[in-house]
């Protein structure tokens, strides 16, 4: 209905103005009315990424991917999070999935593969 999408629209406007606290409340309200609001979960993940809250970011990214396993932006963000956490196996699996489904974020494919390769070479050095 119109009411829920108003929460999402206003949340995006506030997010773009970097008013993360107020936009977070609106995205959460949108989810109350529309538990399948892929965009609200994605924006919440971006807010938690901005706040360095890896736990909440991962929960919201997983919600996006549960609703739409092809969401390349969520996959991209989750690969970066797993690289940050040095979770090699999970990052590799997600990276393979990202390469298969990337649409709007295909330009990020090379960048993310380089980060992944750097992580694996750094791990190899630290294990010697």
Where are these regions (language model features)?
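Canonical positions in the second alpha-helix
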Residues: 30, 63-64, 97-98
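Terminal, low-structured helical/coil segments at or just beyond the last alpha-helical repeat
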Residues: 92-128
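Structural signature of tandem alpha-helical TPR/SEL1-like repeats
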Residues: 16-25, 50-63, 85-94
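Canonical tetratricopeptide repeat
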Residues: 43, 77, 111-115
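Alpha-helical segment of the N-proximal tetratricopeptide repeat
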Residues: 3-33
